Amino acid sequence: MTIQYTFSMIKPDAIKRNKIGQVNTYLENAGLKIVAQKMKFLTKYEAECFYDEHRARPFFNSLVEYITSGAVVLQVLKGEDAIILNRTIMGATNPAEAEAGTIRKDLGESIEANSIHGSDSENSAKREIEFFFNKSEIIE
């Protein structure tokens, strides 16, 4: 097992329903340590840059509109095999298909409003963490 860092974003639907603490509890109970966390409103430009890999997909504009519709909580998580552990506790993208006990099954509302985003690879984690955080913001 390897100690890794990964990126997580609590999405506007969960923020609006006051679920930040509940999401953090899922993450911490899974063995992940929150080493950086901040709340902000993403600008359209930030959202477009962050989701640039999806720019050609038909859902891109609605994704940008959704993610800028309210505040998000940006996080850096640390733990053994943190990327896969975070992906596991998040659950499938579609809450209807996610396993019971996962964040998306228990808190998600739809494929888009599924409460949480998490890095899917080491490269994505590095890029996403560096997109939002300076090294000085990550507290071990």
UniProtKB/Swiss-Prot annotation:
Its EC number is 2.7.4.6. Major role in the synthesis of nucleoside triphosphates other than ATP. The ATP gamma phosphate is transferred to the NDP beta phosphate via a ping-pong mechanism, using a phosphorylated active-site intermediate. Coiled coil: none annotated. Its main location: cytoplasm. The active site is at H117. It comes from Rickettsia felis (strain ATCC VR-1525 / URRWXCal2) (Rickettsia azadi). GO terms for cellular component: cytoplasm. It is an enzyme of class 2 (transferase). This is Nucleoside diphosphate kinase. Its cofactor is Mg(2+).
